[in-house]
């Protein structure tokens, strides 16, 4: 199914650290799913930049990573999508601080920083200051990489008027959390007119792994949020790591440095907890994917959600003023304490899982094909069975005809027939010596003793002229070629095996059996050659006696007897004896050679057998992997019975199984499919099974399934599936209509799915409703427009000109609009009935316009943070502050939480004292009017 895209502006996705990398990975793999061809992807003005202090998510040695493969394609990060900031070690930076002027500004005390950070391994090790130092040392490289990503976008869009840069980071570690502030600043510095959106993941309260917290997990999160708030409020200007002095890039136009912060966790507002390693990156990726490609910003129906994620119409409420602040005596303005350009997001997808269904069918059929590869055992109503068939392999394959074809008969082993193609064709031994005896018989008669003369002539041929060099010389010379002959025999056998396997006539398991039987037969041949040699020696001796006896009889004849028929008969008989004699004598030499050759052939066939077994193992591994893939594509959620997950599948796996069964039991189609898959997997030239096992990887086989077999499956589906049996190309509304039979079912579905969706952060109602000094009137919670707003977009596909389906969609829309609770946030809900996503109904939620202090877990973070910085040991506290904060010790930042009445009174008194002592007014900051 082709994916329609509403992406018309440039989008750059920047992933910082492991969390950012996981989101970019999920996004890129989704790109390959939705836009499966390079041509489609190349039309999207979207570029990625992954920044990390480790390359563990990158391909190694140019090899594709298995976990980045999507339908036979490699979605791994390319080199121009990755910036490794561990190229320079932190310890080296601190030891040579003068060589890093841009870094020097963020290191007040080299010794203290070096002592606090200590030694690092492959990454920043949950030390934010180390993460910032690494980024700062590579900040110019970051800007260059960002500009390169921008160029890639411009090359596609041809339009530089609108660019959005999305920055992703987790706040608990060292790399992403430590570099996020500089990444925002340098991005704004390089692209002053870009829309910059920051996505920051909070620490999980319940860790997926017990070893994730190295003592600073939550403290890092609080420190990072503190810095982000101060940066966005214009209350903190950190050092510019690509220039001198403070980085003053706060913009009153956007009310921040970035346009806004998206903060999220692994628990949504309704208490749904998802895995932060596997599910959460996909949720964020899915939200961003919908925002970039599926939400048409120019369509009025999407206006509310667009305004929500772009923080529009909230300039009057973007900032929270310091409740302990007092008017500046000159300007009368009150300092800003906090930003409210903060949101959180959520997406729930109710979908017909077409890709999963296609993969399940593909891998199920692929598994059946692999059974053919392995066993070639067809069973009616089952297809290719996962078990071998019974057969008399010795009788069927290890027979005289095949041995001759494989050059394992005596004629070939003795070289009576040639083995190497480059050798000449020679006469059979008996024919050769018979011709010699006949051809030289007349010449020999001229001698006094023609019998001896003929014997001498043939003996000379034996010694010097047989095959141009004499028998013993010939075979002695050929011994050097025994390895080549053994390999030629093996190749002949192996090539024949391969062709039969390739044609689908025989399985790899059967080849293994035949191979072992052949080795057993060659062992028997070696024994038979020994016995044949003994028999030939006896034959040779008997012929020699006959030859000698005939010579003596001829010698005993008188002159007249020799001249008449008696002598002629003796001479003719002697020719026969000499033919047999030299044939036997040649065979004896040839048999000795054959024994040596057979020994070498035995070894070669042993190697062949090992190679066939290796290839068989590769098929077994492929079967195991395919079984895993089939299992991975099985339905993992309960569909409408359990709607807690971010993705809810509505499908009929029984219909899918029926289609699979029909196809894999098709006796005509399955052998054709197996042959097509073999042609796709196999190299053009066969060398041997060992090379085949080495050259064909499991990925090659699964790629053939993803690329070739999936297309075959789709074609067969379109040919075979009746309208009510289709499992591909279905409308989600059709599936829902089959499940939601009554109006009550529809209402219950809408209510339940909405109650279990929502943004991935929980807010504290007390903090939301808190009334603060200097934020009265229109800025107070009594004005619902000032805080905690929510926009919801429900996207429903068109009903395919089906009146019944349209009526169902009408009821569904009404149910959704009546299902949202307006009591906790100012909520707008829009239903888009023109979604081009035929297989999906989605709910996108954006909750926005609240201060970070309103996030429910912040109180717990604050307690852990303060305990970490107040151990009672001043040196430890100072070192801990260096580890947590990217610059300074945090005291320069405004308070994330509202101050107490006592603190406000103390601040007012301190302010009066300060004003009395002040000689110069403070530099201007963002202030309330």
Language model: regions and residue ranges:
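Short, glycine-rich nucleotide/cofactor-binding loops
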Residues: 170-177
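Short acidic, glycine-rich surface-loop motifs adjacent to enzyme active sites
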Residues: 166
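Terminal, contiguous helix-loop blocks that mediate binding/assembly
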Residues: 2-15, 19-32, 36-163, 171, ...
């Amino acid at each position: 199914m082709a994916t329609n895209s509403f992406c018309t502006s440039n989008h750059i996705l920047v992933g910082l650290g492991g969390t950012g990398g996981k989101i970019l990975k999920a996004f890129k793999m989704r790109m390959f799913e939705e836009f499966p061809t390079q041509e489609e992807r190349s039309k999207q003005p979207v570029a990625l930049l992954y920044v990390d202090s480790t390359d563990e998510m990158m391909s190694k040695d140019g090899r594709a990573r298995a976990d980045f493969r999507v339908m036979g394609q490699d979605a791994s990060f390319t080199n121009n999508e990755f910036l490794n900031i561990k190229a320079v070690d932190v310890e080296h930076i601190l030891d040579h601080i003068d060589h890093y002027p841009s870094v020097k500004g963020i290191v007040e005390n080299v010794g203290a920083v070096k002592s606090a950070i200590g030694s690092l391994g492959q990454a920043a090790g949950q030390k934010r200051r180390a993460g910032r130092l690494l980024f700062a040392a590579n900040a110019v490289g970051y800007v260059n990489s960002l500009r390169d990503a921008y160029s890639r976008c411009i090359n596609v869009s041809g339009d530089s008027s609108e660019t959005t840069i999305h920055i992703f980071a987790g706040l608990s570690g060292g790399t992403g959390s430590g570099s996020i502030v500089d990444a925002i600043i340098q991005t704004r510095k390089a692209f002053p007119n870009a829309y910059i959106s920051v996505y920051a993941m909070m620490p999980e309260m319940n860790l997926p792994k017990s070893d994730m917290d190295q003592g600073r997990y939550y403290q890092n999160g609080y420190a990072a949020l503190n810095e982000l708030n101060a940066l966005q409020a214009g209350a903190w200007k950190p050092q510019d790591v690509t220039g001198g002095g403070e980085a003053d890039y706060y913009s009153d136009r956007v009310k921040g440095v970035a346009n806004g912060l998206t903060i999220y966790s692994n628990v949504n507002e309704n208490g749904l907890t998802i895995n932060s390693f596997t599910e959460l990156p996909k949720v964020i990726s899915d939200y961003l994917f919908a925002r970039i490609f599926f939400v048409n910003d120019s369509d009025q129906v999407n206006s509310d959600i667009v305004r929500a994620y772009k923080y529009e119409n909230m300039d009057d409420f973007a900032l929270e003023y310091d409740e302990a602040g007092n008017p500046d005596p000159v300007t009368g303005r009150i300092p800003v304490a906090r930003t409210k350009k903060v949101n959180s997001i959520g997406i729930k997808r109710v979908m017909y899982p077409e890709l999963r269904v296609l993969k399940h069918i593909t891998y199920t059929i692929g598994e059946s094909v692999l059974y053919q590869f392995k066993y070639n055992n067809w069973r009616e109503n089952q297809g290719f069975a996962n078990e071998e068939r019974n057969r008399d392999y010795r009788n069927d394959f290890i027979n005289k005809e095949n041995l001759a074809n494989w050059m394992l008969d005596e004629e070939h082993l003795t070289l009576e027939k040639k083995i190497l193609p480059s050798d000449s064709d020679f006469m059979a031994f008996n024919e050769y010596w018979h011709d010699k005896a006949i051809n030289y018989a007349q010449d020999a008669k001229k001698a006094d003793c023609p019998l001896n003369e003929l014997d001498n002539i043939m003996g000379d041929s034996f010694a010097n002229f047989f095959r141009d060099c004499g028998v013993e010389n010939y075979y002695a010379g050929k011994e050097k070629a025994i390895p080549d002959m053994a390999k030629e025999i093996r190749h002949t056998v192996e090539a024949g095996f391969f062709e039969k396997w390739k044609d689908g006539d025989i399985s790899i398991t059967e080849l293994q059996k035949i191979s072992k039987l052949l080795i057993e037969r060659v062992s028997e041949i070696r024994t038979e050659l020994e016995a044949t040699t003994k028999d030939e020696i006896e034959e040779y001796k008997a012929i020699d006696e006959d030859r000698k006896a005939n010579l003596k009889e001829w010698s005993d004849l008188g002159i007249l007897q020799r001249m008449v028929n008696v002598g002629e008969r003796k001479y003719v008989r002697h020719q026969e004896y000499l033919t047999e004699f030299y044939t036997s004598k040649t065979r004896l030499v040839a048999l000795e050679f054959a024994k040596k050759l057979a020994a070498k052939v035995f070894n070669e066939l042993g190697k062949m057998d090992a190679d066939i077994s290796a290839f068989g193992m590769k098929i077994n591994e492929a079967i195991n992997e395919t079984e895993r893939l089939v299992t991975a594509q099985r339905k993992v959620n309960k569909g409408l019975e359990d709607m807690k997950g971010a993705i809810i599948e509505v499908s009929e796996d029984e219909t899918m199984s029926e289609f699979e069964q029909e196809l894999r039991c098709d006796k005509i189609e399955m052998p054709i499919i197996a042959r097509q898959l073999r042609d796709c997997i196999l190299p053009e030239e066969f060398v041997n099974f060992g090379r085949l096992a080495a050259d064909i990887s499991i990925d090659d086989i699964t790629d053939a399934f993803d690329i070739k077999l999936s297309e075959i499956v789709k074609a067969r589906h379109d040919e075979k599936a009746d309208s009510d049996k289709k499992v591909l190309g279905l409308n989600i509304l059709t599936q829902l209509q089959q499940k939601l039979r009554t109006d009550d079912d529809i209402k219950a579905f809408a209510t339940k799915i909405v109650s279990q969706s929502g943004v991935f952060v929980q807010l504290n109602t007390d903090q939301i409703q808190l009334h603060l000094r200097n934020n009265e009137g229109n800025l107070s919670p009594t004005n619902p427009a000032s805080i905690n707003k929510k926009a919801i977009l429900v996207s429903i596909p068109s009903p395919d000109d089906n009146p019944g389906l349209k009526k169902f969609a009408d009821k569904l829309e009404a149910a959704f609009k009546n299902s949202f609770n307006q009591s906790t946030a100012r909520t707008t809900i829009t239903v888009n009935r023109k979604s081009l996503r035929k297989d999906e109904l989605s709910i996108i939620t954006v909750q926005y316009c609240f201060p970070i202090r309103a996030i429910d877990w912040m109180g717990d973070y604050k307690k852990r943070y303060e305990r970490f910085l107040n151990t009672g040991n001043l040196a430890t506290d100072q070192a801990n502050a260096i580890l947590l904060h990217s610059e300074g010790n945090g005291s320069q930042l405004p308070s994330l939480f509202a101050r107490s009445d006592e603190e406000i009174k103390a601040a007012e008194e301190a302010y009066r004292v300060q004003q009395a002592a002040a000689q110069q007014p403070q530099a201007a900051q963002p202030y309330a009017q």
